[in-house]
Curated annotation (Swiss-Prot):
It comes from Streptomyces coelicolor (strain ATCC BAA-471 / A3(2) / M145). The keyword Protein biosynthesis applies. InterPro entries: EF-4, EFG_III/V, EFG_V-like, EFTu-like_2, G_TR_CS, LepA_C_sf, LepA_CTD, LepA_IV. The gene is lepA. It comes from the Bacteria. Pfam families: EFG_C (PF00679), GTP_EFTU (PF00009), GTP_EFTU_D2 (PF03144), LepA_C (PF06421). It is a peripheral membrane protein. Gene3D superfamilies: 3.30.70.240, Elongation factor 4, C-terminal domain, Elongation Factor G (Translational Gtpase), domain 3, P-loop containing nucleotide triphosphate hydrolases, Translation factors. This is Elongation factor 4.
Length: 622
C-alpha cells in the first residue's frame, strides 16, 4: 500500500496545477461506490477501522437499492508513484447514475475536468452509462475507460475492452482493468488520473466565481452547499451573492470533505468544497447557480443553469385522513433536501385531502414515496402517475393539465403531450419484441446501431405518458432483464387524447379519471369497469358502473342488487299474491335507487390505483 502523503496542502493555498477534479460514470451495480471506497482507503482519508461498504451513500435507501441519489465530493491527497515528492489533490465527485437525476449529473460533470468511465466486465456498457458518457463528451472531459469486476468468473475483459475502445476512440490496451472489491489496479488508476486529467484553469485574481453542483440540508447547520471554485477565491466570513436569485448571505463556514467535513479559511481556484451560510431552505442555493462575492463580485454568471422541471405528477393521499398535517410536514422536510420536488394541496371527493406532487421521473417518485413511508411512517395511496398536457381550445384559450380532473370540457382544438427520445440497449435477439413493445406504445423508430455483433442500440421517440406507467417492467420481462433504458425529453407533439371518466351509479369518481389515447380508451374503460365490478360489494339496489368519454358511455358493467326472497312465506297459493309481493319489492328497490349512494371501499381504490396490479395489464394491451 502506498505511503500516505505527510504534507497535504491547504484548500486556500493549493497550486491549481496539483489539483485534479474527476467523477465516476457508471451504471447501477457496476461497482462505483465500491471503487470510491477503495480510493478512500488507498489515499488514507478514512481509517481502516472506520471503513464501511458504500461509505459515501449516506441515505438508507441509497444503501439498500444500491443507487446514489445525492452527489458527494471528497478531497483525496495522492502522491503518484512516478513522482513521490508532489502531493496532488484529487477531488472525486460522486454522481448519481440514474436518468431522473440527469441535471444533477450534468452539473457534477461541469465541475470536473475528467471522468472515469466504469463498466462491469461481466455485463458491458448500459444505456444510462452511454447517456452520461455523451454528456461528459459534450462537456469536453478527458475520459479514462475502466473495466471493473475482473475478478468475477463471468468477466469477459477482452470483449468489453474492445466495445469500450470503439466508443471512446482509444486502443483496447488503454482500457484499465481493475477489481474495486479486491483493490487490484486501483493505485494504477489513481496514477492515471494524475497523468491524464488536466489541471483546472482559472484566474486567481479575478472576482470569485464558484458553481453549485449540489446542496443538502443538515438539521443542525442548515443548508450545506457544495461548490467548485472556477475563478478567484472565497474566504470565510465574507458576504456572498447567489447570481440567479440575487440573495446575499454571510459565509459562516467554508471547507472541504475528506469525507467528513473539515473547515478551512477559504477555497482557491479549482478547489471543490462546501459552504454554510445558515440558510434553512435548499431552494436558496440552486444546483447550477453561480456564487460570487458581494463586494467586487463577478458580473457574468457561469453558463448552464436550469430550473429543474417536474415531468411526472402523482396525487399522494394519506390512508388515514388525520395524517394530512404529518404528510405536509414530511414533504416540507424532503423539499429542504430536494429542490426538484414540487407539490400543492388538492382534494379529491373520493380520497379526501392530499397533495399533487411533481417529480423528475419514475425513480424519483418511487424514492420519495418510499422515504415518506419509511422515514416518516406514513401510509399513502398514490394515484396513477400522469404527465403535463397542454390543451388548446377552439376559442384559442390554453390550459395546462397536471391532473385528469383539470381536463377541460367543451370544444378542444388540439392536445399537446410531452415526448421523450428513448435509447434502449439490448442483445440483438430481442430486437423484434422490443420494437413490437414500442409500436404498441405509439413509438416512432429513430434509428438503430449495432455496438457489437450481439448488442444493439435502438432509438425511439415515445410519448412520456406511455413510459411512466409500466413500460420499464414490460421491457425487462420481454428481454429477460437484459435491456436497459434511458430517456431524455425532446419537446411535445399533438395527439388525439381523451379523458375517460368512471361513473358509479351516475356519479363521477374523480380518482379513477384518466387521460388516454383515443385508440386505447375503450380497452382502458372495459378493464377498469370489470375490475371495479369485482371490487365493489353488492348493494341493496342495482349499481351501474360506466366508463364514459364526455357524455358518451363506452363500457358498462352492472352490480346486481342483493334481493331478499319475498316469496319464502307463500306456500303454493295464488300467482297474483306472489306478483303483488314481487311488485312491492321492485317499488322499494326503485325508491332505494333514487336516494341510495354507493360506498367505494378503501381496498378498491388501493387495488385500482396501485401500479403493481396494473403492471400486468398495461394500458396499451388490448
Amino acid at each position: 500500500m502506498p505511503a500516505i502523503p505527510s504534507h497535504v496542502p491547504e484548500p486556500s493555498r493549493t497550486d491549481p496545477a496539483l489539483i485534479r477534479n474527476f467523477c465516476i460514470i457508471a451504471h447501477i451495480d457496476h461497482g462505483k461506490s465500491t471503487l470510491a471506497d477503495r480510493m478512500l482507503q488507498l489515499t488514507g482519508v478514512v481509517e481502516q477501522r472506520q471503513m464501511r461498504a458504500q461509505y459515501l451513500d449516506r441515505m438508507d435507501i441509497e444503501r439498500e437499492r444500491g443507487i446514489t441519489i445525492k452527489s458527494q465530493a471528497v478531497r483525496l491527497p495522492w502522491a503518484p508513484s512516478h513522482d513521490k515528492g508532489a502531493t496532488h489533490i484529487l477531488n472525486m465527485i460522486d454522481t448519481p447514475g440514474h436518468v431522473d437525476f440527469t441535471y444533477e449529473v450534468s452539473r457534477s460533470l461541469a465541475a470536473c475536468e475528467g471522468t472515469i468511465l466504469l463498466v462491469d466486465a461481466a455485463q458491458g456498457i448500459e444505456a444510462q452509462t452511454l447517456a452520461n458518457l455523451y454528456l461528459a463528451m459534450e462537456n469536453d472531459l478527458t475520459i479514462i475507460p475502466v473495466l471493473n469486476k475482473i475478478d468475477l468468473p463471468a468477466a469477459q475483459p477482452e470483449k468489453f475492452a474492445e466495445e469500450l475502445a470503439n466508443l471512446v476512440g482509444c486502443d483496447p490496451d488503454d482500457v484499465l482493468k481493475v477489481s474495486a472489491k479486491t483493490g487490484l489496479g486501483v493505485d494504477v488508476l489513481l496514477d492515471k488520473v494524475v497523468a491524464e486529467v488536466p489541471a483546472p484553469v482559472g484566474v486567481k485574481d479575478a472576482p470569485a466565481r464558484a458553481m453549485i453542483f449540489d446542496s443538502v440540508y443538515d438539521s443542525y447547520r442548515g443548508v450545506v452547499t457544495y461548490v467548485r471554485v472556477i475563478d478567484g477565491q472565497l474566504n470565510k466570513r465574507e458576504r456572498i451573492r447567489m447570481m440567479s436569485t440575487g440573495a446575499t448571505h454571510e459565509l459562516l463556514e467554508i471547507g472541504t470533505n475528506s469525507p467528513e467535513m473539515l473547515s478551512a479559511d477559504g477555497l482557491g481556484v479549482g478547489e471543490v468544497g462546501y459552504l454554510i451560510t445558515g440558510v434553512k431552505d435548499v431552494r436558496q442555493s440552486k444546483v447550477g447557480d453561480t456564487v460570487t462575492s458581494q463586494h467586487k463580485g463577478a458580473t457574468e454568471a457561469l453558463g448552464g443553469y436550469k430550473d429543474p422541471r417536474p415531468m411526472v405528477f402523482s396525487g399522494l393521499y394519506p390512508l388515514d385522513g388525520s395524517d394530512y398535517p404529518e404528510l405536509r410536514e414530511a414533504l416540507d422536510k424532503l423539499q429542504l433536501n430536494d429542490a426538484a420536488l414540487v407539490y400543492e394541496p388538492e382534494t379529491s371527493a373520493a380520497l379526501g385531502f392530499g397533495f399533487r406532487v411533481g417529480f423528475l421521473g419514475l425513480l424519483h417518485l418511487d424514492v420519495i414515496r418510499e422515504r415518506l413511508e419509511r422515514e416518516f411512517g406514513l401510509d399513502l395511496i398514490a394515484t396513477a402517475p400522469n404527465v403535463v398536457y397542454r390543451v388548446i381550445m377552439e376559442d384559442g384559450t390554453e390550459h395546462t393539465v397536471t391532473n385528469p380532473s383539470e381536463f377541460p370540457e367543451g370544444k378542444i382544438n388540439e392536445v399537446y403531450e410531452p415526448v421523450v427520445r428513448a435509447t434502449i440497449l439490448a442483445p440483438t435477439e430481442f430486437i423484434g419484441s422490443i420494437m413490437e413493445l414500442c409500436q404498441t406504445r405509439r413509438g416512432t423508430l429513430l434509428g438503430m446501431d449495432y455496438l457489437s455483433e450481439d448488442r444493439v442500440e435502438i432509438r425511439y421517440t415515445l410519448p412520456l405518458a406511455e413510459i411512466v406507467f409500466d413500460f420499464f417492467d414490460q421491457l425487462k420481462s420481454k428481454t429477460r432483464g437484459y435491456a436497459s433504458l434511458d430517456y431524455e425529453p425532446t419537446g411535445e407533439q399533438t395527439s388525439s387524447l381523451v379523458k375517460v371518466d368512471i361513473l358509479l351509479h351516475g356519479d363521477k369518481v374523480d380518482a379513477f379519471s384518466a387521460i388516454t389515447h383515443k385508440d386505447a380508451a375503450y380497452a382502458y374503460g372495459v378493464r377498469l369497469v370489470a375490475k371495479l365490478r369485482e371490487l365493489i360489494p353488492r348493494q341493496a339496489f342495482e349499481v351501474p358502473i360506466q366508463a364514459a368519454i364526455g357524455s358518451r358511455v363506452i363500457a358498462r358493467e352492472t352490480i346486481r342488487a342483493i334481493r331478499k326472497d319475498v316469496l319464502a312465506k307463500c306456500y303454493g297459493g295464488d300467482i297474483s299474491r306472489k306478483r303483488k309481493l314481487l311488485e312491492k319489492q321492485k317499488e322499494g328497490k326503485k325508491r332505494m335507487k333514487m336516494v341510495g349512494s354507493v360506498e367505494v371501499p378503501q381496498e378498491a381504490f388501493i387495488a385500482v390505483l396501485s401500479s403493481d396490479d396494473s403492471a400486468g395489464s398495461g394500458k396499451g394491451k388490448k
